[in-house]
Amino acid sequence: MLDKEVLVIGAGLAGSEAAWQLANSGVPVKLVEMRPIKSTPAHHTSEFGELVCSNSFGALSPDRAAGLLQKELRFFKSLIVQTADKFAVPAGGALAVDRSKFSYALTEQLSNHPLVEIKRFEQLDIPSEENITILATGPLTADDLSYKIQDFTGIDDCHFFDAASPIIYGDSIDQEIVFKASRYDKGDPAYLNCPMDENKYIHFRNELIEGEQANLKDFEKESANFFEACLPIEEIARRGVDTMRYGPLKSIGLWNPKWGDLFDRENRLKKRPHAVVQLRKEDLEGKLLNMVGFQTNLKWSEQKRIFRMIPGLEKAEFVRFGVMHRNTFLESPKLLLPTLQFMKRENLFAAGQITGTEGYAAAAAGGLLAGINASLLAKGKKPVSFPDESMIGSLMNFISNKNQILSNQKKNKFQPMPASFGLVPELTKRIKDKRLRYKAYQERSTEALNDFKNKLDSCFDKDHLLSKIY
């Protein structure tokens, strides 16, 4: 006999992951997605898990917070991360994907699962209390549902502004000017690099600052606050002459062999560019390239004019221009438990960026936890929290304020949080060396999750997702 059906609203990264976890545990799922009936300011397709900003999931190495989070998700057979691994493109030490193949594969896998029923319509309200429901509508939740969520929580939503970088055709780049390299020669030479001298950099910065901005809606103009990890490039430029050079345009660790001996200090200081614009592959063939760190709210005509001032991009043809959009998130510390259940309704979950986690892997982590817990609830069992020692657990603890990390004052100023070693509990023994400390965090996480997985397996039948994938 099948368990009671669970409703998942939103087929982004979190919703797709949640639906997969539920279905693989034997729980039927109704997955509701409003696209293509209604789109958003940032989406371009109707595929599930469309990546609207970067195509990167962050650092691969588990001695980085993003890498440890990915490792934990692989351990629990995350649909999102396993699919990302399958459609990865070269990106140095990061996990980046061919976004078209990635989202198409997610859609196909979920569409072909016998326990997943897909419905394409706009969900206008929160379903009745009879339904186990996961809200995974993301930062671009449609207005009608957003208002219903505000009515339910009694709290106005929070928001910030996010932006996406332009994508250009690889064959429109001047290959005589750009060079292939990864920073510090880490991994394959995954990036194309556009070097700039000081004069060109100064001129480029001035044009960025003076460039005409796209119009914001009236309600957006009232509070155009940005998320620091995804600032528009023109906003970074305004912060100081050298701010871009120590951010997305830094030249440190990048070297073109044509410039001569890297280890000749005099030559290195003479030849090293003042700044470098990096281009990252969007697909394996390199036909499409993303301008790394070039999120922007410039008008499209201004993007074409100004970005063609970059050496090597004088004749660049744009597949997609950068855009800025308003992202909504819940004031989660006042609303959610570490299980991702709403405090005031145990069979209603929230997952993904709407909860205030930042980053693709973090969204998948929320979907994974919400899916597991909705499955447990459907089976009449008690939802679980991930171990504090894990990156998944630490993120969920932060957004739910489990360990009182946020003071009452800061709870009123809750802002999205990416994976960070600053969230995990301190080690019992202080380790000064950062690399060794991060390695210890990783080892502690692995041990805690092994114990947690064994206990979780006992809650499910032998065919549960943790032991046998559909």
From Swiss-Prot:
The UniProt entry's GO CC annotations, sorted and at most eight, read: cytosol
Task: Note the Pfam families from the entry.
Answer: GIDA
Q: Which residues form a coiled coil?
A: none
Q: Name the cofactor(s) required for activity, per the record.
A: FAD
Which biological processes are named by the entry's GO terms?
A: tRNA methylation; tRNA wobble uridine modification
Localization (cell): Cytoplasm
Instruction: Identify the species of origin.
Output: Prochlorococcus marinus (strain MIT 9301)
Q: Which GO terms describe its molecular function?
A: flavin adenine dinucleotide binding; tRNA (uracil(54)-C5)-methyltransferase activity, 5,10-methylenetetrahydrofolate-dependent
Q: Which protein are we looking at?
A: Methylenetetrahydrofolate--tRNA-(uracil-5-)-methyltransferase TrmFO
- InterPro entries, alphabetically? FAD/NAD-bd_sf, MnmG-rel, MnmG-rel_CS, MnmG_N, TrmFO
What's its EC?
2.1.1.74
**Which residues does the annotation say bind FAD?**
10-15
Reactions catalysed, as given in the entry: uridine(54) in tRNA + (6R)-5,10-methylene-5,6,7,8-tetrahydrofolate + NADH + H(+) = 5-methyluridine(54) in tRNA + (6S)-5,6,7,8-tetrahydrofolate + NAD(+); uridine(54) in tRNA + (6R)-5,10-methylene-5,6,7,8-tetrahydrofolate + NADPH + H(+) = 5-methyluridine(54) in tRNA + (6S)-5,6,7,8-tetrahydrofolate + NADP(+)
Transferase keyword on record: yes
Which keywords does UniProt give here?
A: Cytoplasm, FAD, Flavoprotein, Methyltransferase, NAD, NADP, Transferase, tRNA processing
Cross-referenced PROSITE patterns: GIDA_2
Q: What class of enzyme is it?
A: transferase
For this chain, the family text in UniProt reads: Belongs to the MnmG family. TrmFO subfamily.
Q: What is this protein's function per UniProt?
A: Catalyzes the folate-dependent formation of 5-methyl-uridine at position 54 (M-5-U54) in all tRNAs.
